[in-house]
Amino acid sequence: MSGRSRGRKSSRAKNRGKGRAKARVRPAPDDAPRDPDPSQYQSLGEDTQAAQVQAGAGWGGLEAAASAQLLRLGEEAACRLPLDCGLALRARAAGDHGQAAARPGPGKAASLSERLAADTVFVGTAGTVGRPKNAPRVGNRRGPAGKKAPETCSTAGRGPQVIAGGRQKKGAAGENTSVSAGEEKKEERDAGSGPPATEGSMDTLENVQLKLENMNAQADRAYLRLSRKFGQLRLQHLERRNHLIQNIPGFWGQAFQNHPQLASFLNSQEKEVLSYLNSLEVEELGLARLGYKIKFYFDRNPYFQNKVLIKEYGCGPSGQVVSRSTPIQWLPGHDLQSLSQGNPENNRSFFGWFSNHSSIESDKIVEIINEELWPNPLQFYLLSEGARVEKGKEKEGRQGPGKQPMETTQPGVSQSN
């Protein structure tokens, strides 16, 4: 045998010895702690993988020795179920499967992998399952004597469930407690609803009513302030409008005659008198509009001496509506009221309305002046004859046939068809 072949044999023997030395794992002694450090699992797997890599050069005795060593480790792990880690065995089995798939070997290695897989399943089912690295500890790991209790598959798998179940039971108990407390409170409220609750409601109602009265008083004061403010602004515009109207001769007389309803109260002489009307003012009595004061300003005319005629409406001491008017100082031979005393149409004349204080509740003229003529006299001044007749027909249609003026006949005078 040559020296080269001797060197090869010696190197193989050395490699075989190294592989055996690194692949051998000493079992843990009986007095070892019950909870091995997870770093030992990692170092054990790394040593086994290193041994397999170093033993990869030979396919003979080295593979068999490594397989035997792994089998012996599996048997020792099966004997020490509470002490070993099932996850480590699964990792070694997975490594063997991966190595076998990457590098197919003899049939003996494949059968060993199958045996390891079967042993691993058995160990994972009946043995212990080690806690993975950096995983949280579940439950109390120490026994009654203060020593660490072994973690079995049952305790590791059921530990969180038992704790969760305990919490659910605790939550259910808490729920029952809250429901019972709510029922007790409801019963107490039902039992306590009696005269004391009614008295409290009355006190609350009185407080709310008092607040409403205070709010209404504040609203009234605010309304009065706004009425004064905008009344002054409105008065400025009204004065400006009156000044402009005075520069238009016969403006108010024409507006009276063009109004479809006011024109029915005017005869030919009254239309002549109203032609001297140069200004009209409507003054509201009080901020609450409790009455009206209508002022008619006339130029010098051949009918009466008054420069202003006033018709006033207001509330009397007992609350009824009363009216007052200025006595008209008629010139001789031009007293329209005395000339029309025997005429039944006197009540439908303008000056008959001015001096009459009996039919106040059904006073139509003051309503027309306050609500239609005074707010916008320009629209009636600009009405033509055709537009005035058309507008009068529209108003009569809205009022209905019952409100149309009835024709009156003088006694002893018969009407002919």
Curated annotation (Swiss-Prot):
InterPro entries recorded: NAP-like_sf (IPR037231), NAP_family (IPR002164)
GO MF term list: chromatin binding; histone binding
Low complexity: compositionally biased ranges: 93-103
Keyword Amino-acid biosynthesis: no
Keywords, ordered alphabetically: Growth regulation
Recorded coiled-coil stretches: none
GO cellular component: chromatin; nucleus
Biological processes, Gene Ontology terms: cellular response to gamma radiation; nucleosome assembly; positive regulation of cell population proliferation; positive regulation of phosphatidylinositol 3-kinase/protein kinase B signal transduction; positive regulation of protein ubiquitination
One Pfam family matching this protein: NAP
Keyword Cytoplasm included in the entry's annotation: no
Job of this protein: Involved in modulation of cell growth and cellular response to gamma radiation probably via regulation of the Akt signaling pathway. Involved in regulation of p53/TP53. Suppresses p53/TP53 protein levels and promotes its ubiquitination; the function is dependent on USP7 and independent on MDM2. Proposed to displace p53/TP53 from interaction with USP7.
Name of the protein in its database record: Testis-specific Y-encoded-like protein 5
Organism: Homo sapiens
Annotated gene: TSPYL5
